[in-house]
Amino acid sequence: ALAVALGCAPSAHAGRARAAAKPSTKARARRVAINPHITAPTDAAETAAVRYGRLSQDDCEAELNARAIEFTREDARGVLAPVRVASELHGVSFHTDEKPAARATSPYQIADCRLVLALDDFAAILERHGIVEVRHYSMYRPPHGWPDGKIGSRHDGALAIDAGRFVGDDGKVLDVDRDFHGAIGARTCGDGAGPRPSTPAAVELRAILCEAVDAHLFNVVLTPNYNRPHKNHFHLEVTAGVSWFLVH
């Protein structure tokens, strides 16, 4: 359903994605007109998400090394640049609720290198808010019956994370399910947006998310405002080869 809403194939090959990387002004306007939650800024090429989405595996890994991010290259079907991060990002750990021993080999801890760059930028925001841990449901979800050589998108391509809880250095937890306080169809960030009721936890959680939105770290940001299946997490995604942003 999301692919239809965005007007793109469920899993476009990287070559086709690159060809569509620079939509015309009219195409951008059509997308915005169809979905008010989509924006297509004229300076999209300069944004973090778009720049990261265009990186090759080697160039992306070189950037991880330049940032002193420890990682190992993984083998993951459908993923262009699969890695397993071995270090915290700006003092923030991103992990599932699996036991530490299980995380070491869990496919859900594999991420495309380009997502890791976006998460590293996001971690800088989290650090300012005193967040030291992000508990997520998954990044990579191994696809079934996947053709050899096909590059995936979203979770199939390890380009998305479903973040459910944010743990502070004081032990307090911002829980998306409990603290987001949104409504399906409501605006997530910007004028007129905000949690109802605006409890301190809800305000802090919304501030964290909307700082990431303002920084254009992810092409797709889906929240409990999008639909019921997203009631307990933020879906944060780098979408390769596009120059639009969906926030809902």
Label the model's feature ranges:
Residues 1-70:
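N-terminal secretory targeting signals
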Residues 109-136, 142-173:
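Mid-length scaffold segments of soluble, non-membrane domains
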Residues 46-136:
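Active-site acidic/histidine clusters and adjacent loop/turn architecture
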Residues 7-9, 59-61, 112-114, 188-190, ...:
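Sequence contexts marking disulfide-bonded cysteines in secreted/extracellular proteins
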Residues 77, 139, 226:
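Residue-level "edge-of-site" marker
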Residues 16-18, 28-38, 72, 80-86, ...:
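Catalytic cores and adjacent binding grooves of peptidoglycan-active enzymes
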